[in-house]
């Protein structure tokens, strides 16, 4: 009996110490992290293996992200289709919200993130279904081609093809071709910003609103304060960014293009109104803020929301993710509904 008491006491002490140590991880040089987010950040920091952009690592990364995401909500209808542009077959998934509105609905092109090398338009449906229902919009999610197998401009070309398809087929989908929104997170935010620029420059379909969530807007410069502050400590590692940039855009000269680095565009006037959301613990934070400020300076109506305490993608924080989803849904609804 005495041995059992000692054993239980030892185990309890070890658990208390472990909890205390892990709780200390919530205190960082950049401020407090929520406990689950702190665990995510610390586990990522301990993983010092360089990112490998292979099909095998892509499958592992996709599965890891799905584990942190809640399930989507039920919608009126979800349908898979495929569009063909310039001989390329591009899978899309269409989401119709539950609504009593008899008229045509706004339509929104969703562009997934994943560093241009992982993810797809269908695997993580919670944000998509939430936005479709709460903004009362039809959403088309595009499964664009990924690097390194398909470097720039493949992904952007696929997104542009999806935008043109949406405009041409909106009425058949029950949508209004004059009320098109676009958006995406991280690499998807980069592609959405680039898509808005390209549509403006090439006289493409008119976009009424763009939602840029934790976007990468500058694939050239690395002297951002948020790069130095975050380093490799907060889930998205600065050391991995250059690998992803080089995989997506192998030619360094192409990285100066506004369709790759929207922040480097000389003229941002005439772009659609925007919502830009950044995360405090994200190395991409400052370039997202800089892009929002440049949009405002160019006369583009722009909302900027900087989410305190959030990691890139808001992993480890359902509360922050829910708040961001609510802000996005309200902004999209207001912009696309007359």
Mark where each language-model region is.
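N-terminal Sec-pathway targeting helices
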Residues: 1-16
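Alpha/beta-hydrolase superfamily serine-hydrolase fold, recognizing
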Residues: 18-60, 64-338
